[in-house]
Amino acid sequence: MIGRDFSKGEDRWVVDQDFIPRRSSTASVVIEGVQQGEDASLYIMWTKIGYPPCSKVVPVMVDDVPRELQPDPLTWHSPLCDFVVEQKHKVFSIKRGSGKNYIDMDLLKEIMKQQSTISQENYKKGYIKREEKAKSLKK
């Protein structure tokens, strides 16, 4: 809206306004379907659970939900989501006044860089898993 890329700027504190992910966002999901004739079990849900900018991409297939996304038997929380929410609280660390609306961009950039590296690996792993499953279905 204002034509600025805050990820490249030098401002440390930025108001969380007019961004696609909001402080209240709980996940970002993309469903990758299959082509006509392919088995529906080859669908992949690419998930960033918790506050998306602090999360990593995790591939989820119909019959394989990664342990880090499954609920803990005591808390019924996803361990990954709890970790990501902790990171979000660090990024939105100001508690007084309107501080809850300010993002620490220095910390967010650091977290996003780490999570991006992990996400790239997870994309590769997800596609390999999908290819292996597709081959096993053809047997």
Task: Enumerate the predicted regions with their spans.
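C-terminus-biased signal that marks the final domain/tail of proteins
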Residues: M1-K139
